[in-house]
């Protein structure tokens, strides 16, 4: 059940009976007033202050313990075992010049041998071409000889048998005419 109000009589009496309640009301001072809350706006990511990246620390080569390049180990120094082998560059120019001279001599020798091989291959190609031309000339000469011999045979036969050649030609013509008159059937 909901609470019920008391009678109006009781309330009026209670106010009169309480001497402090009838005294003039003095308002209590509230605690210091707060300013009204303001909306906090988040900054956009495209804003210049947000886009600036923080500088990363750059380490020097000494701090990183990187191996030094282009250095040769002195004669007395022994490399520790297990260390990875790499290219070792020469510091002194005389040593480098001698190494370069050796390498260049090897390369020149290879180049010279390549040139020699190329010359030999060229000579072989030329020889093969000459052989092929000679073969073709032989074939042509044989063909011409065969043609001449056939012509000579026809000339010798044609002198005595001129009439027989003409009669065989007529029979060949008549047989070709009969073959030409064949019936043909066409389908639509």
Curated annotation (Swiss-Prot):
One of its GO terms (cellular component) is nucleolus. GO terms for molecular function: mRNA binding. The keyword rRNA-binding does not apply. GO terms for biological process: intracellular mRNA localization; mRNA transport; ribosomal large subunit biogenesis. PANTHER family: 60S RIBOSOMAL SUBUNIT ASSEMBLY/EXPORT PROTEIN LOC1, 60S RIBOSOMAL SUBUNIT ASSEMBLY_EXPORT PROTEIN LOC1. Residues 163-173 have a biased composition (Polar residues). It comes from the Eukaryota. Component of the 66S pre-ribosomal particle. Residues 130-151 have a biased composition (Basic and acidic residues). Signal peptide: none annotated. Residues 1-89, 130-188 are annotated as: Disordered. This is 60S ribosomal subunit assembly/export protein loc1. It is found in: Nucleus, Nucleolus. The gene is loc1. Required for efficient assembly and nuclear export of the 60S ribosomal subunit. Keywords: Coiled coil, mRNA transport, Nucleus, Ribosome biogenesis, Transport.
